[in-house]
Amino acid sequence: MAKDLFGTDGIRGVAGQYPLDRDTVYAFGVALGKDAALHAAKPEILIGADTRESGTWIAELVAGGLASQGAQVRYAGVITTPGVAYLTRTGSFVAGVMISASHNPYDDNGLKVFGHSGFKLPDDEELLIEQEIFRLREAPVAPQPLSLTVEEPLVRQYLKYLSGISSVRLDGVRVAIDCGNGASYRLAPELFQGLGADVVTICCEPNGRNINLNCGALHLEALQQAVVAHRAHFGVAFDGDADRAIFVSSSGQVVNGDAVLLACGRALKAAGKLAGNTVVSTVMSNLGLERAFDAAGIRMVRTPVGDKYVLEEMVRLGAALGGEQSGHVIFREYSTTGDGMLTALRLFEIAQQAGTGLDELTADLKIYPQRLVNVRVREKKGLLELPAVAKEIRRVEDAFGGAGRVLVRFSGTEPLARVMVEGPNLEQVESFSTSIADVIRREMGE
């Protein structure tokens, strides 16, 4: 049975509107509390949030629902998604809830659940929780929010863990950090200052409404300018919940998740720590990355988009490294989810050991032209079953003759069809992606 509430990254929506209205959020807490009671007599549940203004009332409603089922709730306050995953798997928690909509605007929010092992819940368990939510909504009760007190030691515990992972010292290194006015706004500057870095911060002043606003991992212009203006050795931008990072080299060039995977994959292989000489990525990763891995004797395995699917394949294969072009990178030895700050630590360490900057680490990576077009759609059903869409995709694939790629899929979190076309010629890529998007827009656009 297909899920209606849970997407590729939990439940997402506009805060205050279904499925993040007060009744449904409270029902989510009740449903999760019932699920948790199956695993422990007095389950402890961790809650964390990013900096959105809706985070507090959502947390209190979730907590109220959990408490109604006998669960004990502990609140970390503002913390990153990987912070919640880490604390959940290392503490006594049955589950952890992160309240965030990642890179989305401030008026969106979301609910992401981690099991006691620190992994996102499997689809079948999400479906059971979802079915209970629907049952509860048939006879709703007045939500009873629970006032929460932030337990700062929880955040300190996560920061201490990160600080101890790497032997890297950043004395004499200038790092520019864009926290996207999100969950990392305190933690990232403190982490890198503690390692000796001279830290330049931008967009580290959240007000509840400026998260991801022209800043962070999806808007790199300000960071690029800051790196060049302050002559920083590295720049790093996090998204709203800091489960991903995108980097900027000292020359102001963007270093995305594909380049990070290549640098980290080769370093792990050289150290004898790349299990099976395999790296897991997604269908969005560039052809150039696949060919660079081939040249290095590393196999790249692709999954559907979503770090959840990357991690599932990593576990299945026993892989040590996986990630996405968007900047989610998973080091399985240290984390059960993408962690932007951990990725930064590892990448800076690799650059330091190589005695180079970020530009030089992946100078041989040839990026094929790639274009992504988003088309807003009426509903997310039957995209590839539409004859006109299927015909246009076949036409483009035939024209490429095996030299390019076409990927058409629905977004897991928004009412969008995403068209990705990649090939050796930019003009051709732009033409083909536009033609496919036009057909989709005509067939099922809003």
Curated annotation (Swiss-Prot):
Protein keywords: Isomerase, Magnesium, Metal-binding, Phosphoprotein
Modifications after synthesis and translation: Activated by phosphorylation.
UniProt-listed InterPro entries: A-D-PHexomutase_a/b/a-I (IPR005844), A-D-PHexomutase_a/b/a-I/II/III (IPR016055), A-D-PHexomutase_a/b/a-II (IPR005845), A-D-PHexomutase_a/b/a-III (IPR005846), A-D-PHexomutase_C (IPR005843), A-D-PHexomutase_C_sf (IPR036900), A-D-PHexomutase_CS (IPR016066), Alpha-D-phosphohexomutase_SF (IPR005841)
GO terms under cellular component: cytosol
Enzyme nomenclature, EC number: 5.4.2.10
Cofactor(s) this protein requires: Mg(2+)
Function (record text): Catalyzes the conversion of glucosamine-6-phosphate to glucosamine-1-phosphate.
NCBIfam families: glmM (TIGR01455)
Cofactor binding description: Binds 1 Mg(2+) ion per subunit.
Pfam families listed in its UniProt record: PGM_PMM_I (PF02878), PGM_PMM_II (PF02879), PGM_PMM_III (PF02880), PGM_PMM_IV (PF00408)
Domain of life, per lineage: Bacteria
Residue(s) carrying Phosphoserine: S102
Known catalytic reactions: alpha-D-glucosamine 1-phosphate = D-glucosamine 6-phosphate
Single Gene Ontology BP annotation: carbohydrate metabolic process
Family the entry assigns: Belongs to the phosphohexose mutase family.
Presence of the UniProt keyword rRNA-binding in the record: no
HAMAP family: GlmM_B
Protein name: Phosphoglucosamine mutase
Enzyme class: isomerase
Binding of Mg(2+), residues: S102, D239, D241, D243
GO molecular function, one term: phosphomannomutase activity
Catalytic residues in the record: S102 (phosphoserine intermediate)
